[in-house]
Amino acid sequence: MGEIEIKQNMNHNENSEKMNQITMLGTGNATVSQIYNTCFVLQTSSTLMLVDAGGGNGILSQLKKVNVQISDIHHLFVTHAHTDHVLGVIWVIRMVAQCKGYEGLLHVYGNDKVMKVIKTIIDMILAKKQLAKVAERVVFHQLEDGDCFEVGDMKLECFDIQSTKEKQFGFRAELPGTSEDNAASDNASEDNLAKPLVLACLGDEPYNEQNRRYIDGVDWMMCEAFCLYADRDTFKPYEKCHSTALDAGKLAEELGVKNLILYHTEEKTLATRKENYTREAAKNFKGRIFVPDDLEVIEL
């Protein structure tokens, strides 16, 4: 297992109140056109990390809508090299290269296939002047299964989701603050009080039992739900190596997580998506369920 330590170049007041949140830039699957492909910003009071970037320059519009500037982005985790996750990364890198006054470095994290795809594309399509800036400003970190690394005040551990379609990494992130388990116990021991707040991102394919240790009992689980189980004959999730809101709810209950975030959905039921996906997941899961819209902020 390798280990990478990267410190966010931002001022941090140790006495400031911690604020952890996710901003969903997109919540849709690969072929959506009314909403954006699934990607999000994970941030604390002092650290910001972009996770995936969707399938095109729509990422620039989504970032602008939530008031995140290119100059704010110094960490980018890419789960896998499918079009709806990696092509927006090319635009982010291009904008970093041509951003006047960009300070510091952009750290891009991903597996070997992700690194190969990104580097191949930028080498083929960016101008020499832009490539020179990429060499100055962008650092590529090739990750292996189980690698641990720090992004500012977040401690991450990545894991291979064992996809049969495309090599893909999810991650477990320890965030500032303490786990909800601590608040639930009035007689918590000192060891338990130190238990961190943990989020797990499972990528965009079904859970594999090999990764239980990364996800079991986490405070927040981010999980794909391609459609409702009730609509499985229409959207064919299982044939596409995806799962449903019902499956996600069962998984969350089985793993003992506290909060469930569903994403990477179809877009034909947007008017009822939040209500119906929540209801279906709640048939088995007793914790809190979030079915966010694009640009929605979830406080962790």
Q: For each of these PLM feature ranges, what is it?
A:
Residues 106, 111-168, 176-180, 186, ...:
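Metallo-beta-lactamase
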Residues 50-54, 73-80, 111, 199-205, ...:
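Active-site neighborhood of phospho(di)ester-bond hydrolases with catalytic His/Asp-centered motifs
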Residues 22, 52, 63, 80, ...:
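Divalent metal-coordination and catalytic microenvironments
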Residues 6, 17-66, 168-181, 186, ...:
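Conserved beta-strand hairpin/beta-sheet module of binuclear metal-dependent hydrolase folds
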Residues 186-192, 196, 206-295:
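Cap/insert and terminal regions of metallo-dependent hydrolase folds
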Residues 57-107:
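Active-site metal-binding motif and surrounding structural segment of the metallo-beta-lactamase
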Residues 6, 42, 147-151, 298:
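Short acidic-hydrophobic surface loop/beta-edge motif
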Residues 29-30, 83, 108, 112-115, ...:
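Short histidine/acidic/glycine/proline-rich micro-motifs that form metal-
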